[in-house]
Regions:
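A short beta-strand motif characteristic of beta-propeller blades
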Residues: 172-178, 212-217, 252-257, 296-302, ...
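Short loop/turn segments immediately following the C-termini of beta-strands
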Residues: 199, 239, 278-280, 324, ...
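Blade-level signature of beta-propeller repeat domains, shared across WD40, Kelch, NHL, RCC1
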Residues: 401-431
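Beta-rich, blade/repeat-based domains predominating
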Residues: 178-193, 219-238, 242-243, 259-281, ...
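Short loop/turn segments immediately following beta-strands, especially the blade-tip
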Residues: 332-339, 426-431
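Non-catalytic cap/lid and distal C-terminal segments of serine-dependent acyl enzymes
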Residues: 1-155
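Blade/loop signatures of beta-propeller domains
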Residues: 156-172, 286, 340, 431
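A short loop-to-beta-strand structural motif that recurs across blades of beta-propeller domains
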Residues: 203-205, 243-245, 287-290, 328-330, ...
Length: 431
């Protein structure tokens, strides 16, 4: 399920063969097809899935999409992740294999349903035969289908219905900025401007309504997070001094509170603030949530593995808190006095095969009620019922450390990825 094999093929095997035999091999996935059966079948599909720029055509015979090292997760991944530019031909046998890992005949049909659900360009054949059926008469049909209209490039399908409600056809990721050190803690102002911290560079930046990025404040004490309040002022926590700082719209700072080392901060429309922090002495349950109100700090929850980003549901009735060292984000009901009740590990997140945790970081909501969570797997999008419905990866497939929606029309999604920022127009709007 991981990308280990495709990196081995593309970065080691093929370059070695080309050099050893003095071959001029194309490096474009559009000129390549990868084929495999059984465990080789899922390996071939995983290669195209993780790196379509290396292999955009795949022939999968009796693919082992069963519970061997996470293979059973592929049908769900195909449904949730934005569709990728892959053309696939898959087969299964009516008397295919069955063992403790699962039933190949059934799971291959599940892959068929998932590929159809997400609009992939593919064909699926059920063959009267056993495990490995599909290498005979189907070969010619498979090759004709996989290579049709070549050299025209294979295009991604429309994605699943939930993704179609969010994405705009033809609107892909664009590089909005690069050269940063550690982008974190993005927050959107009422007018659609976005602010974020570049902690290692000791700066806070602003993304204007025209998409241009400028410095809002320098020498911030290594601001770790930012939030924009209802009055337009900006709050942050200094990693260096342990101070809660307020910046006015001109970028002038003042100290609000001393002795606070927070991971994330969130402003409530009523003027109060929520802060997450983590006690390093409590490795498995040191995360807390604090309420800052009338100059006083009150702990309103504890026992989180590693408390990270926060977001209000658009009606401010519920608060979500990321748990960075697990596959969850918490949901709380906000009481009238600002304290938190009805805590639940509610938002279940996808975890990469090679990761031990989802790595939930920054969170935000859209006006339409969808929650966007920055994770190691990309931006995971869910609704009020909890499960992740859509997962968006960025072009370099890197970890997303912060997420925000903003811009002139409040319909531009921003993904912050360490030293780069990506953006794309969507059918959702900032709160």
């Amino acid at each position: 399920v991981s990308d280990n094999n495709v990196r081995f093929f593309d970065e080691e095997i093929l370059p070695f063969v080309a050099k050893q035999y003095q071959l001029n091999l194309s490096t474009s996935g559009n000129d390549r097809c990868i084929v495999g059966g059984s465990s080789g079948g899922i390996t071939a599909f995983a290669a195209a899935w993780h790196k379509p720029e290396a292999f955009s055509r795949v022939y999968c015979v009796s693919g082992s999409f069963v519970a061997f090292r996470g293979g059973h997760e592929f049908p769900t991944m195909v449904r949730k992740f934005e569709a990728r530019p892959i053309r696939a031909y898959l087969t299964t046998g009516t008397r295919d294999m069955e063992n403790v890992a699962g039933d190949w005949f059934l799971v291959d049909q599940e892959m068929d349903k998932s590929l159809k659900f997400s609009g992939y360009d593919y064909q699926f054949r059920i063959i009267d035969g056993g495990h490995g059926a599909g290498y005979g008469d189907e070969w010619q049909e498979a090759m004709a289908f996989l290579w049709k209209n070549w050299p025209e490039k294979v295009k991604a399908g429309p994605s699943a219905p939930r993704a179609q409600e969010i994405l705009i056809p033809g609107e892909d990721w664009q590089l909005a900025g690069e050269g940063f050190k550690s982008t974190r803690g993005a927050s959107t102002a009422a007018n659609g401007e976005i602010f974020f911290a570049d902690t290692s560079a000791d700066k806070i930046h602003r993304i204007g309504l025209d998409g241009q990025i400028s410095i809002f404040a320098e020498k911030t004490g290594n601001a770790h997070c930012v939030t924009v309040a209802a009055d337009g002022s900006l709050y942050t926590i200094s990693e260096k001094s342990g101070q809660l700082l307020r910046y006015d719209t001109a970028g002038k700072s003042s100290v609000v509170l001393d002795g606070i080392l927070g991971h994330s901060i969130l402003a409530h429309p009523n003027g109060s603030l929520y802060v997450t922090d983590n006690d390093a002495k409590k490795a498995n349950n040191g995360g807390s949530v604090w309420l800052i109100k009338d100059g006083q700090k009150q702990q309103v929850d504890a026992g989180i593995k590693f408390a990270t980003g926060m977001a209000f549901r658009p009606d401010q009735w519920l608060l979500s808190v990321g748990e960075g060292h697990s596959k969850w984000a918490y949901s709380y009901q906000i009481a009238d006095d600002g304290t938190l009740t009805n805590k639940e590990r509610f938002f279940h997140l996808h975890v990469h095969d090679w990761d031990d945790e989802a790595g939930a970081e920054c969170l935000c909501y859209s006006q339409e009620g969808r929650q966007f969570i920055a994770t190691k797997s990309g931006i995971q999008i869910s609704a009020d019922d909890g499960p992740t419905q859509v997962i968006l990866t960025v072009p370099d497939k890197g970890r997303v450390t912060a997420v925000a929606i903003g811009g002139k029309d409040k319909d531009t999604l921003y993904a912050f990825c360490g030293n780069k920022i990506w953006s794309r127009k969507i059918q959702q709007h900032a709160t």
